[in-house]
Amino acid sequence: MKVNLEWIIKQLQMIVKRAYTPFSNFKVACMIIANNQTFFGVNIENSSFPVTLCAERSAIASMVTSGHRKIDYVFVYFNTKNKSNSPCGMCRQNLLEFSHQKTKLFCIDNDSSYKQFSIDELLMNGFKKS
């Protein structure tokens, strides 16, 4: 499957506005493609910080709720120009759970620059089910 990264970035730029970030204002949006279907998520902060939901896990929940279990592509959009943004450890483990060897992950900054990773590059020696 060929992806249109320009279109995906435009979608994520619209979706990221839905993030609920009253504490950090660090907005993140995620699009997952699984079996040619798209699933979106945004980060949702909570005054009890451990309850905060990351955009990646939000998108995974949508995907699983729709009956899908294998991620083909992950696009994570950050509202900063940090150049070193990437999923947190908890999200990396969750992404690994539903990824396969060919899963591709893109980390995109708000200037549309991006870095591409494989799931193994993102989480080397991750804990996998047997």
Curated annotation (Swiss-Prot):
GO biological process, one term: cytidine deamination
UniProt binding sites for Zn(2+): 54, 88, 91
Binding site for substrate: 43-45
Family: Belongs to the cytidine and deoxycytidylate deaminase family.
SUPFAM superfamilies found in the cross-reference section: Cytidine deaminase-like
Reactions catalysed according to its record: cytidine + H2O + H(+) = uridine + NH4(+); 2'-deoxycytidine + H2O + H(+) = 2'-deoxyuridine + NH4(+)
Domain of life: Bacteria
UniProt keywords, alphabetically: Hydrolase, Metal-binding, Zinc
Species annotation: Mycoplasma genitalium (strain ATCC 33530 / DSM 19775 / NCTC 10195 / G37)
Segments forming domain CMP/dCMP-type deaminase: 3-130
PROSITE patterns linked: CYT_DCMP_DEAMINASES_1, CYT_DCMP_DEAMINASES_2
Protein's name according to its UniProt entry: Cytidine deaminase
EC class: hydrolase
